[in-house]
């Protein structure tokens, strides 16, 4: 017996909706008290179409960041959301070299995420726009870099900029990725 598996998320939802959901996931992960809870904006269960479009524009830089990821062979929305999060921490670390000093990042449980979120909020961490993430990504990742090397380069840059703060948390299917995946499934 042979088994055939079809990936139909994009077919059923449309690619547009799938990327809308990715923006919503980032919004929830950064702002909801179930996750980091660092934003002042409350997460609502049924945002308007205008809000969804605004979030997508904000996080994905009018889709330029999504297109850039896809050119590198990154097609999974879970992976794209992970890359955004890693790059957002790196943008923040470049803006304030002491931001992560003394912190211990733990993405493995909701209480640990909230603790990290509280510490980041106290240190005035601000989620960067998709444009800032795109600018950083373009400086880190050469145009001809393939998928696996993209993750290596971005994770290495964050590890270097934040010392051991994110040790053991990065990488595909690491605890940061799993936390974002859980938010996606929420």
Description of each model-found segment:
Residues 55-186:
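A metal-dependent, Asp-based hydrolase signature
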Residues 1-61, 79-82, 89:
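Active-site neighborhood of HAD-like aspartate-dependent phosphohydrolases
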């Amino acid at each position: 017996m042979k088994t055939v598996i079809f990936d139909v998320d994009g077919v059923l939802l449309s690619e547009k909706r799938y990327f809308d959901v990715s923006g919503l996931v980032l919004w929830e992960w950064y702002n909801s008290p179930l996750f980091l809870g660092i934003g002042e904006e409350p997460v609502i269960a049924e945002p308007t179409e205008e809000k969804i479009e605004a979030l997508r524009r904000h996080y994905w830089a009018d889709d330029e960041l999504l297109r850039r990821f896809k050119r590198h062979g990154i097609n999974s929305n879970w992976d794209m959301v992970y890359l955004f999060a890693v790059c957002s921490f790196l943008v923040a670390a470049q803006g304030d070299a002491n931001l992560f000093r003394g912190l211990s990042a733990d993405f493995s449980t909701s209480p640990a995420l909230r603790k990290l979120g509280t510490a980041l909020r106290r240190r005035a961490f601000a989620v960067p726009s998709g444009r800032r993430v795109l600018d950083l990504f373009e400086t880190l990742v050469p145009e001809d870099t393939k998928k696996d090397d993209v993750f290596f380069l971005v994770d290495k840059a964050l590890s270097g900029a934040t010392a051991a703060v994110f040790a053991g948390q990065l990488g595909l299917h690491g605890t940061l990725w799993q936390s974002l995946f859980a938010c996606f499934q929420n």
